[in-house]
Amino acid sequence: MCLSPVKGAKLILIFLFLGAVQSNALIVNLTDSKGTCLYAEWEMNFTITYETTNQTNKTITIAVPDKATHDGSSCGDDRNSAKIMIQFGFAVSWAVNFTKEASHYSIHDIVLSYNTSDSTVFPGAVAKGVHTVKNPENFKVPLDVIFKCNSVLTYNLTPVVQKYWGIHLQAFVQNGTVSKNEQVCEEDQTPTTVAPIIHTTAPSTTTTLTPTSTPTPTPTPTPTVGNYSIRNGNTTCLLATMGLQLNITEEKVPFIFNINPATTNFTGSCQPQSAQLRLNNSQIKYLDFIFAVKNEKRFYLKEVNVYMYLANGSAFNISNKNLSFWDAPLGSSYMCNKEQVLSVSRAFQINTFNLKVQPFNVTKGQYSTAQDCSADEDNFLVPIAVGAALGGVLILVLLAYFIGLKRHHTGYEQF
């Protein structure tokens, strides 16, 4: 089905019907004077739970219909975001935005809106009106690369479960031709494809190095500092700057891994009482930093979750929901330029370098005044110093008592 052109571009929107069961695969081809400027092919559906007039919850699944409009879709450029907007009649609309950076583009602000006033789609709905659900995920894709993901990506954003699969996507297409360079999603990769194997080469043989009982220690380089920011709509709600080094000590040979920001994607979300920063790359399925508000006055790092693949291809995962790091007043940021060690468990530590983080109350996309980690040390040293001083006084009192007692006893003997 070919739809009418958008101003400044042309959109071809095709629905494919596969097999006996309708599976509407969207193919979107936005064009400009040079040719294709945005290409997307994917499948999706949405499972929505809503309350009915008989005081029960009803769950429906909405797939892409065979009729849709595309008002508002655009190619974008260096200054303006690209976007795809799809309308499923009166009841449902869906949109995704793309922002171009120097070396990559971001996929963000995936928004689903559904109207429960449509009794055909939502029979017996109590809360009638338009409901909007925003997916907080933020993906980075290099320019001149097509992103592919055949696996089902599931996002549970209560009361909606969103599923996407069969994705072929490239925004800001260069020279009017879709790239042959591919970036495959992590879900399509197996541990054996992402686990690094170190080889040495000789003229006729290749030898895989294996750890020995007495490996020669080599210094681990300091990790590169990355900048991460999460947006809530058009407003930045979380900022983090840090170099990250992961240490796993349960292996026979400790596993140390530096996170490279250039090859790491990040997503997250912001809520009034909690905030999340999630990192992932080819070796890390996810690394979550979850922040919480304490006593309505301070924030702290409450939880860390990690799932990653080790050099031998095995998976490692750990979760700790009872942490208490990076404590600072709301409205400020937390900073620590020196190396810090976060003990998540006995087997897993995170070393941070040049850390600065603000998960709440970000103003104008900038960090607020920072509380330095040296203040934590001062707060820790003060009670130690006071305790030491009191201990010294107590020792002097006891010494004086025993000396006096001894003299008194000697006096009795002389008498």
UniProtKB/Swiss-Prot annotation:
Report the leader peptide range. 1-25
Regions of this protein lying in the Lumenal compartment = 26-379
Q: Which molecular function terms from Gene Ontology are attached?
A: enzyme binding; ion channel inhibitor activity; protein domain specific binding
Q: In which tissues is it expressed?
A: Detected in liver and kidney (at protein level). Detected in liver and kidney.
Q: What happens when the gene is disrupted?
A: About half of the mutant mice die between 20 and 40 days after birth. Survivors are smaller, weigh 10 to 15 % less than their littermates, but show normal lifespan. Both mice that die early and long-time survivors display an accumulation of autophagic vacuoles in liver, pancreas, cardiac and skeletal muscle. Mutant mice display an increased ratio of heart weight to body weight and severely impaired contractile function of the heart muscle. Hepatocytes from mutant mice show a decreased rate of degradation of long-lived proteins.
Q: Where is this region: Disordered?
A: 202-227
Q: Could you tell me which cysteines form disulfide bridges?
A: C37-C75, C149-C185, C237-C270, C336-C373
Q: Which residues form a coiled coil?
A: none
Positions with biased composition (Low complexity): 202-213
Q: Which InterPro entries match?
A: Lamp2-like_luminal, Lamp2-like_TM, LAMP_CS, Lysosome-assoc_membr_glycop
Oligomeric form and interacting partners = Monomer. Forms large homooligomers. Interacts (via its cytoplasmic region) with HSPA8; HSPA8 mediates recruitment of proteins with a KFERQ motif to the surface of the lysosome for chaperone-mediated autophagy. Interacts with HSP90 in the lysosome lumen; this enhances LAMP2 stability. Interacts with MLLT11. Interacts with ABCB9. Interacts with FURIN. Interacts with CT55; this interaction may be important for LAMP2 protein stability. Interacts with TMEM175; inhibiting the proton channel activity of TMEM175.
**Family listed:** Belongs to the LAMP family.
**What is the protein's given name?**
Lysosome-associated membrane glycoprotein 2
Residues of the region (Hinge) are: 189-233
User: Which residues are listed as membrane-spanning?
Assistant: 380-404
- Topology versus the membrane: Single-pass type I membrane protein
Q: Where is this region: Second lumenal domain?
A: 234-379
